[in-house]
């Protein structure tokens, strides 16, 4: 059942007034594939625009806080924690992990996904002058804790 549709099929914001306030946490990831030379430039701190990881981290945190402004029908949330981590993976990839937390009436999956996505977009923006062939991939929810639907953890396919 799609909870964002009413009985006539019209979109509406889900009413969470009567839902219990519980601890909720979500973790999402994204990857940015690039030329090895681009990744080396980022890791060595030689990018002319500055510290790519630091800017992408701040962009991801800001994006989590602005999710309800970007995603229609998403509730504005009082996040109590947002952590965005970036690391080199192999010789041609940046791995991004975003974790959001709160005590509230609705989940934080969209905030974690938005944080990871915007961090990836920021890397693309900062590096596009040297590598227009970058690919943003594997934007996905890794884990969700709390709420009525309980615990979800991505199971890797063998």
From Swiss-Prot:
Pathway(s) this gene product operates in, as recorded in its UniProt entry: Cofactor biosynthesis; molybdopterin biosynthesis
Any GO molecular function: cyclic pyranopterin monophosphate synthase activity
Gene3D superfamilies assigned to the protein according to its UniProt record, in alphabetical order: Molybdopterin cofactor biosynthesis C (MoaC) domain
UniProt catalytic activity: (8S)-3',8-cyclo-7,8-dihydroguanosine 5'-triphosphate = cyclic pyranopterin phosphate + diphosphate
Active-site residues, record numbering mapped to chain: 125
Matches recorded under Pfam families: MoaC (PF01967)
EC numbers: 4.6.1.17
InterPro entries: MoaC, MoaC_bact/euk, MoaC_sf, MoCo_biosynth_MoaA/MoaC, Mopterin_CF_biosynth-C_dom
Chain residues that bind substrate: 73-75, 110-111
Keywords per UniProt: Lyase, Molybdenum cofactor biosynthesis
A biological process from GO: Mo-molybdopterin cofactor biosynthetic process
Enzyme class label: lyase
Family listed: Belongs to the MoaC family.
NCBIfam families: moaC (TIGR00581), PRK09364.1 (NF006870)
Matches recorded under PANTHER family: CYCLIC PYRANOPTERIN MONOPHOSPHATE SYNTHASE, MOLYBDOPTERIN COFACTOR SYNTHESIS PROTEIN A
Biological role: Catalyzes the conversion of (8S)-3',8-cyclo-7,8-dihydroguanosine 5'-triphosphate to cyclic pyranopterin monophosphate (cPMP).
Subunit description: Homohexamer; trimer of dimers.
Annotated protein name in UniProt: Cyclic pyranopterin monophosphate synthase
Origin species: Ectopseudomonas mendocina (strain ymp) (Pseudomonas mendocina)
Name of the gene encoding the protein in the UniProt record: moaC
């Amino acid at each position: 059942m799609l909870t964002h549709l009413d009985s006539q099929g019209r979109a509406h914001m889900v009413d969470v007034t009567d839902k219990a306030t519980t601890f909720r946490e979500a973790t999402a990831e994204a990857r940015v594939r690039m030329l090895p030379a681009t990744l080396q430039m980022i890791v060595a701190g030689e990018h002319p625009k500055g510290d790519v990881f630091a800017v992408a981290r701040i962009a991801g945190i800001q994006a989590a806080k602005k999710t309800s402004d970007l995603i229609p029908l998403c509730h504005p949330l009082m996040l109590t924690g947002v952590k965005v981590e970036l690391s080199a993976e192999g010789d041609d990839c940046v791995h991004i992990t975003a974790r959001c937390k709160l005590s509230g009436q609705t989940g934080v999956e969209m905030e974690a996904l938005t944080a990871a996505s915007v961090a990836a977009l920021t890397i693309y923006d900062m590096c596009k002058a040297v590598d227009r062939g970058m690919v943003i991939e594997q934007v996905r929810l890794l884990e969700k804790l709390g709420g009525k639907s309980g615990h979800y953890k991505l199971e890797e396919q063998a």
